[in-house]
Amino acid sequence: DGKTIDQMSIQRIEHIIESLKNETYQPKPAKRVYIPKKNGGNRPLGIPSFEDKLVQEVARMILEAIYEGHFESTSHGFRPYKSCHTALTHIQHQFTGTRWFIEGDIKGFFDNINHNILIDTLRERISDERFLRLVRKFLNAGYVDNWKYNRTYSGTPQGGIISPILANIYLDKFDKYINEYIERFNKGEKKRRNAVYFQKNTQAVNLRKKLKVETDPCVKAELTEKAKKLQIEMRNIPCSHDMDENYRRMKYVRYADDFIIGVIGSKVDCEKIKADITKYMSDVLNLELSAEKTLITHAQDTAKFLGYELSVRKSYAMKRN
């Protein structure tokens, strides 16, 4: 807009405050720029004017004070003390024993946020209609691309200071829906024990007892060799049954518009979860999950999340893509 931070003065700040009070403040269209994506395309960013950045930062601080304490712990994007690393650590610690991954992909999320749904969601916690009208002004401000003005009817511009927290507020409903879904889905206290493993374990305990009291070197060497072989056998035998129809678990983590679900259960369970969350996204949030990119992947193969490949062997292995 031709104005810089160096030109900021008390008078200019007072003018902004007054225009906010009497609701004459009108955000300027964001300047659209493009940055290259890894897949070869371009990602559009909307760069606000300096005054709009200033007002948006104040609005962001207000929204954060209202909402941060109510967000779910499974949300890791654009939040204080959370990051890609905390999301991956969450997976490493919480997704133990996962048999299937569901990779979530929301089609054009930032461009398709429904303004009316977002404002109604904000209204559930914010009673100040003047503040809500200001947020709507930012949503409707539009953008300038190649000197041409374009109005925005949906979405929140990537590059806007309040866009990340508005995105989290929008998807917080989904986070809470998933947590309720998990409570209904989970079943059983623990997996059914594998009788073969515990039979071998009993043999190992008895061998160790014999070794403690045995004095004959030849017999002791023979018992030691048996114990070693038994230990090797036990490494390849699970202590519980992988497929226990009376035991199910579901885990979830989200970073911005990327999410992944871990399931201990059957592929049929995963297909139902995918169908249910697709319907919720469409019916409640007016968003579309990509049928091609929302994948169900066996945990022994690799699922992608935040640029990492996730798989389950005897322990989690995460390697940089």
For the regions a language model picked out, list residue spans one by one.
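Non-catalytic terminal/accessory segments
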Residues: D1-N321
